[in-house]
Amino acid sequence: MKEYSAYLVLKPITDAQIRQIKSISENYNLNIDIGESHLEFEYAGRDSSRFVVKFLRDIAPIVGKAFGEVVCEIINDDRDNDFEFYQIRDGKLLFQTGKIVRGQERIID
């Protein structure tokens, strides 16, 4: 299962761009909250067709640059979850993978 969490701060976009992004989100059945300077959404479930990533890729040229990132937590059965991080910069979607590295357990007195 994947859990996406997005809060992006946008440089101000026009009403036409907002409508265009809403239309793209509807094509992917993704519920978003968008205004002239923000984009926010959460999604949890299967994403085998990577529709959330495709949505982000499709809106990147419209947005141009966004501050913040989209975090995707990939929940594994072994509780050693993986992470994917997405950013929009220069009209392109950038991607990084990540893992949480745990230190040794300690007793708190």
Question: What is each model feature region?
Answer:
Residues 23-109:
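Charged interaction segments
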Residues 1-27:
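Short, extreme N-terminal segment that most often corresponds to the first beta-strand
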